[in-house]
């Protein structure tokens, strides 16, 4: 099932994708809700980010092939870091929906993109095991983890590099019936394929990721977790 958040004539709601239409949902998609008879053509609505989360997490260096593409120009410490679980947060204010414009900061020298699978949390999660994690995940969506480089290249924080306004396109919807263990991820720019990989190459899979973050932080319904980019990263 695919859940989409949308807007039409200034009114916002959730709907379930039914062919080329959205069937309107009444209630809380993370709690009690039901499907109504109201339907809108997808082409007639504005698709919004699937959630507006309390937190927007990300896992860095989570694919061996991604690390391999960069390791020639980096020191051995980079490889060591790639073997550790290193989550970080992207600012929720950077989130935009499908088709919205990514604004490039005038101060940046270089901007690049990373197509990633995103975990959507469905229930409050605290200290869950990897085996329990699927019960706390509502589904999955897609995101472009946009990054920029500039005079802040050596700044170890990501606040300028990763969290500028519009640097978090997410969507278009939440897929609830996806097995995350072997998903093919294809990134295209202007129709041209620039990267291809599989979630089977993750160092820390989706269930391990939820478990590890929830050891120290409560995850809430609607929270998003970027799971890393496979393959190379081109500008």
Where do the PLM segments sit?
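Catalytic-pocket segment enriched in acidic/His residues
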Residues: 46-50, 66, 149-235
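Short, charged beta-turn/beta-strand-edge "cap" motif at the junction between a beta-strand
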Residues: 9-11, 63, 124-126, 230-234
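A generic local secondary-structure boundary/capping motif
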Residues: 46-48, 75-77, 102-111, 125-132, ...
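Residue-level recognition of short, solvent-exposed, well-ordered loop/turn junctions
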Residues: 52, 97, 112-114, 220
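N-terminal non-catalytic cap/leader segment that marks the start of a structured domain
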Residues: 1-85, 178
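Structural signature of FAD isoalloxazine-binding scaffolds in flavoprotein oxidoreductases
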Residues: 75-97, 113
């Amino acid at each position: 099932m695919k859940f989409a958040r949308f807007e039409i004539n200034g009114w916002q709601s959730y709907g379930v994708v039914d062919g080329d239409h959205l069937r309107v949902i009444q209630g809380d998609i993370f709690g009690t809700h039901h499907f109504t008879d109201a339907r809108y053509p997808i082409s007639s609505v504005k698709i919004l980010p699937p959630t507006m989360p309390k937190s927007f997490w990300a896992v860095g260096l989570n694919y061996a092939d991604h690390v391999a593409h960069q390791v020639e120009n980096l020191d051995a410490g980079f490889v060591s870091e790639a073997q550790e679980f290193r989550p970080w947060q992207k600012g929720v204010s950077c989130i935009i929906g499908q088709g919205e414009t990514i604004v490039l900061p005038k101060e940046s020298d270089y901007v690049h993109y990373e197509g990633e699978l995103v975990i959507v949390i469905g229930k409050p999660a605290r200290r869950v095991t990897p085996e329990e994690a699927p019960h706390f995940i509502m589904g999955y969506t897609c995101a472009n983890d946009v990054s920029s480089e500039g005079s802040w290249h050596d700044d170890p924080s990501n606040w300028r590099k990763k969290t500028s306004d519009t640097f978090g396109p997410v969507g278009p919807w939440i897929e609830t019936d996806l097995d995350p263990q072997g998903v093919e991820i294809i990134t295209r720019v202007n129709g041209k394929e620039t990267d291809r990989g599989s979630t089977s190459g993750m160092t820390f899979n989706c269930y391990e990721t939820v478990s590890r973050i929830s050891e120290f932080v409560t995850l809430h319904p609607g929270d998003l977790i970027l799971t890393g980019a496979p393959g190379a990263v081109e500008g």
